[in-house]
């Protein structure tokens, strides 16, 4: 019976790809348009590195954008494969890799296509600020589960579907403070932790942790918090070998 990950290369919205293609300018400028991502990146890296030994690990970065997290993971000694469907962002990532000397295997590829290649399974998979931008996020989670080694971990960051998230992540960030371009996020696509937990269970993964993540624009810094009503991080583990090899 075909499963959700058999829908190869169909799980995207062209409008989202076009939108992110327009975000390439200044991607690696910590004071530029992607300033919030630069502030979030150390928090994301620390969250991952406390749960996975990165030195020598095989890591997949799904929806890698211009490579901020990909390079940070590689600097910790991980062997990183990074995929995105926006050619302009992969070009940015590759060019920066040439400048930095950090080796990452960047690919213009959907995770469903990568899964179809049946690569060696990964020790860890990162899917950061990506699930809220695809029409079928549960299928992404399912594909990630099938690409993990037994005992491998999936790391997700996304935005909760709450009034607080709408007011701060959409109205505040896009229209008041203008930290992000208008239209970056759609409230209806935000994901409640309970929804993510259900997708993880269905994919055969065990949810280990959910932690809130808060960006403070007045200080341009981010931190973990007990509150998950806006941004949050989650970690899930694959307990069965079948999920990495089927």
Swiss-Prot record:
Gene transcribed to yield this protein: ubiG
Function, as annotated: O-methyltransferase that catalyzes the 2 O-methylation steps in the ubiquinone biosynthetic pathway.
Organism: Xylella fastidiosa (strain Temecula1 / ATCC 700964)
Keyword Transmembrane in record: no
NCBIfam families: UbiG
Record-stated family: Belongs to the methyltransferase superfamily. UbiG/COQ3 family.
Record-listed S-adenosyl-L-methionine binding positions: 44, 63, 84, 128
Any single biological process term in GO: methylation
Catalytic activity: a 3-demethylubiquinol + S-adenosyl-L-methionine = a ubiquinol + S-adenosyl-L-homocysteine + H(+); a 3-(all-trans-polyprenyl)benzene-1,2-diol + S-adenosyl-L-methionine = a 2-methoxy-6-(all-trans-polyprenyl)phenol + S-adenosyl-L-homocysteine + H(+)
Protein name as annotated: Ubiquinone biosynthesis O-methyltransferase
GO molecular function: 2-polyprenyl-6-hydroxyphenol methylase activity; 3-demethylubiquinol 3-O-methyltransferase activity; polyprenyldihydroxybenzoate methyltransferase activity
Domain of life: Bacteria
Enzyme class: transferase
């Amino acid at each position: 019976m075909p499963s959700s990950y058999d829908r190869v290369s169909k799980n995207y919205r062209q409008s989202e790809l076009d939108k992110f293609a327009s975000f390439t300018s200044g991607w690696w400028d910590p004071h530029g348009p992607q300033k919030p991502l630069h502030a979030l990146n150390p928090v994301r890296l620390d969250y991952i590195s406390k749960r996975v030994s990165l030195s020598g690990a095989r890591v997949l970065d799904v929806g890698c954008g211009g490579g901020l997290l990909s390079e940070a993971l590689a600097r910790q000694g991980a062997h990183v494969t990074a995929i995105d469907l926006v050619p302009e962002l992969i070009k940015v990532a590759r060019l920066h890799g040439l400048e930095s000397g950090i080796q990452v295997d960047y690919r213009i590829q959907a995770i469903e296509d990568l899964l179809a290649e049946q690569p060696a399974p990964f020790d860890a998979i990162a899917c950061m600020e990506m699930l809220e931008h695809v029409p079928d996020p549960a299928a992404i989670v399912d594909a990630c589960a099938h690409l993990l080694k037994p005992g491998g971990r999936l790391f997700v960051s996304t935005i909760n579907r709450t009034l607080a998230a709408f007011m701060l992540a959409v109205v505040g960030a896009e229209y008041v403070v203008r930290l992000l371009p208008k239209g970056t996020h759609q409230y209806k696509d935000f994901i409640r932790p309970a929804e993510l937990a259900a997708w993880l269970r269905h994919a055969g993964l065990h949810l280990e942790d959910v932690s809130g993540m808060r960006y403070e624009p007045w200080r341009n810094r981010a931190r973990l918090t007990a509150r998950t009503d806006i941004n949050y991080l989650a970690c899930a583990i694959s307990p069965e070998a079948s999920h990495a090899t089927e």
